[in-house]
Amino acid sequence: MFVPFVLRFEGRRPQARELVLLATMTALAVAGRAAFYWLPQCKPVCAIVILTAVAFTPEAGFVTGAAAGLISNFFFGQGPWTPWQMLGFGLVGFVGGVLFSGRRVRLVPLLLYGFLSVFVLYGVLLDTASMLMYNAAPSWQLWLATCASGVVFNLIHAGSTAVFLLLLYQPLLSKLARVKEKYGLLE
């Protein structure tokens, strides 16, 4: 499930300095997730991944999100949910990059995207994964019940993503734009 995204990223033969920048953004997302461990579902990971994709490329967002999911779970616990989280974080970044990368980004549409993508894309994906992993006989009724039980958690995660986007939008995007222009990275 990750192969097309990784192949597309690797196909452009990234420079070492680009990989260092993505590793830094991944470390920032992991540190943010660890710093807010005490607040359930209030994590800056998706906001950082979205801003990475917006500042650079959709593939950069996917790689940052997938790596952040894998690495942060060394602190939070690996399990059968890890690939699903990696895919969810990565897709939130990739789609954000497709929608916003390479153009002037307005705050309100970005906040709406952050909220909706985390609630619909990440939330439904992880709810579906939970149903598939923990039930021997999946059904549509079971899927609806699983999604319904996750609504509050997904709303909190989506709302916190919008808040983190609001707080990080200007400072992080301006710094990333400066780095991109100065070093000609991820164009």
Segments (PLM) and residue ranges:
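Hydrophobic alpha-helical transmembrane segments
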Residues: 19-24, 47-48, 62-66, 83-87, ...
